[in-house]
């Protein structure tokens, strides 16, 4: 893809650079451009990217499908964090579905036609941003649940969480509008098709704008939000010293560190590519190195589909009990249908948290605080 969020096509050797990908380098001197060949970059990408995309697809699909099945089967009355986690799993799955298309496109060329070019690119961008936004929503939920459990508890209703989830999808859809409008197939050379955006005579401006948008909405603002929310949560945990405080602090730190490690290298590379296109610095050799870096760091960033759901889901004792119930049901069914139901019932009963249960993590502290302030919907249901 071009300057949208979609995976970047490999560099080519012609000088038609203004409307093409991040991998092109816009030289003022056309002679210098022609001397900057990127055959090695293209060869590397044709091997590395399809293999890495396939690995991410298999691992991410397995983990997110498991998460989705557990949430749908065992969490009929979902709290805010579980609604966000469910949407995160859906977002990741839709994101992962696009990777085989890009892998085939890199290894060969775009063979899926113009309609799928536009649709896959749009689907990619929507779920690229929605996945990051839902992670931020989960951080906000934990912040309200632990730091402001009493005064802001009315903000943490299922209706409001569904509303916020709808807003996230709407914003992500709006961000993908350039894909809907500009992305199309291009034949170059004859018989070889590529799928990327064509911005007409305003290619450079659009590329700079969309990269800035990606750095800001896709990394900087979510990172600052997570640092603020989890630092405040950490202060509360240190002050209250609940059981399991150490584990909860480690979970909070792990979530922030994981987001930074996965996304910072990619966003830094995008920023350096922007400076390169503006000719603030660089030459052909620098351009080649950044092309390699962009392929590698982009692939590392895509690992968030595999790691983020695991980190968030397994930070909750409640979810671990749900997972045990699910695995007991599946394994028990293959071993003995009669024992499967007993195992499922036993695990399901153990998944109910009580006031006497030990707090083992950050999510469990929030659950305990939530029990002290039942939300308005639950009170209405009980009174009815």
Curated annotation (Swiss-Prot):
Tissue and organ distribution: Found in endothelial cells lining afferent lymphatics in dermis and lymph nodes. Also found in lymph nodes subcapsular and medullary sinuses, tonsillar lymphatic sinuses and lymphatics in mucosa and submucosa of small and large intestine and appendix. Also found in some malignant vascular tumors. Expressed at high levels in Kaposi sarcoma-related pathologies. Expressed on apoptotic neutrophils (at protein level). Expressed primarily in placenta and fetal liver, and found at very low levels in the lung and lymph node.
One GO BP: positive regulation of cytosolic calcium ion concentration
Chain segments carrying region C-terminal cytoplasmic tail: 327-384
Cytoplasmic side, ranges: 72-92, 141-162, 239-250, 315-384
Lineage: superkingdom: Eukaryota
Disulphide linkage map: 117-195
Record's keyword terms, sorted: Cell membrane, Disulfide bond, Endosome, G-protein coupled receptor, Glycoprotein, Inflammatory response, Membrane, Phosphoprotein, Receptor, Transducer, Transmembrane, Transmembrane helix
Record-linked InterPro entries: CCR1-9-like (IPR050119), Chemokine_rcpt (IPR000355), CXCR4/ACKR2 (IPR001277), GPCR_Rhodpsn (IPR000276), GPCR_Rhodpsn_7TM (IPR017452)
Biased composition (Basic and acidic residues): 365-384
Localization (cell): Early endosome; Recycling endosome; Cell membrane
Induction of the gene: By interleukin-6 and interferon-gamma.
Gene Ontology molecular function: C-C chemokine binding; C-C chemokine receptor activity; chemokine receptor activity; scavenger receptor activity
Changes after translation: Phosphorylated on serine residues in the C-terminal cytoplasmic tail.
Predominant subcellular localization, coarse grouping: other
Domain notes: The C-terminal cytoplasmic tail controls its phosphorylation, stability, intracellular trafficking itinerary, and chemokine scavenging properties.
Function comment: Atypical chemokine receptor that controls chemokine levels and localization via high-affinity chemokine binding that is uncoupled from classic ligand-driven signal transduction cascades, resulting instead in chemokine sequestration, degradation, or transcytosis. Also known as interceptor (internalizing receptor) or chemokine-scavenging receptor or chemokine decoy receptor. Acts as a receptor for chemokines including CCL2, CCL3, CCL3L1, CCL4, CCL5, CCL7, CCL8, CCL11, CCL13, CCL17, CCL22, CCL23, CCL24, SCYA2/MCP-1, SCY3/MIP-1-alpha, SCYA5/RANTES and SCYA7/MCP-3.
Name the UniProt record assigns to this protein: Atypical chemokine receptor 2
Species per Swiss-Prot/TrEMBL record: Homo sapiens
